[in-house]
Amino acid sequence: MQLPLTPLSFSGTLLLMAMSNFLLWEHVTSSASPRLSTRNLYQRVVELSHCTHDLASKVFTDFNMKFGKSICRQKLMLYTCHTSSIPTPENREQVHQTNSEDLLKVTISVLQAWEEPVKHMVAAVAALPGTSDAMLSRAKELEERVLGLLEGLKIILNRIHPGAVENDYTFWSGWSDLQSSDEATRNIAFYTMGRCLRRDTHKVDNYLKVLKCRDIHNNNC
């Protein structure tokens, strides 16, 4: 028989999740050491990328359940992702036509565009009335994963393409909406952030699988 989670066991579960994430993140960020080969670093980054997208999907589910029902669907059409201005490959053919250096750089650009938003997202979630521990924990963990993934990719870029110049990334201006006293504006901001983060982590995950196949397995995968 499966026992319900008591407050203590629930806290323990969150702690185990946080520790698991910390160890995975540490594997990536400690990779500046020559002891971790580029092959192994790529493997760590791809694993982290998959976990990051999975977590982003869960965070979007949280936001959708909390804010989605009160949102006018017509209004959502007016809100685009702040990363939409970044020119990214949009289908399999375009991905395979993009050389590895450019694909890696655009992947970094997408993640860099989320560097500030995920930090503000955690603060905004923490300030929401009635926020559950689980929802806040997932938001914090997602921030750590995005930042860890970004750091790991920068290391890979410097190793494989030394001297490569990173692309510019898109400025995010959504902080005021997350803090808005207008509930509808705030709800749309949270919903849009969750939807766009899920979309972009999926892109990143797909790009990294292609890059790993090219750079590590010489397309034999």
UniProtKB/Swiss-Prot annotation:
Gene3D superfamilies: 1.20.1250.10. One of its GO terms (molecular function) is prolactin receptor binding. Pfam families: Hormone_1. GO terms for biological process: female pregnancy; mammary gland development; positive regulation of cell population proliferation; positive regulation of lactation; positive regulation of receptor signaling pathway via JAK-STAT; response to nutrient levels. It is found in: Secreted. CDD domains: prolactin_like. Keywords: Disulfide bond, Hormone, Secreted, Signal. GO terms for cellular component: extracellular space. InterPro entries: 4_helix_cytokine-like_core (IPR009079), Somatotropin/Prolactin (IPR001400), Somatotropin_CS (IPR018116). Disulfide bonds join C81-C196, C213-C221. Residues 1-30 form the signal peptide. Belongs to the somatotropin/prolactin family. This is Prolactin-3B1. The gene is PRL3B1.
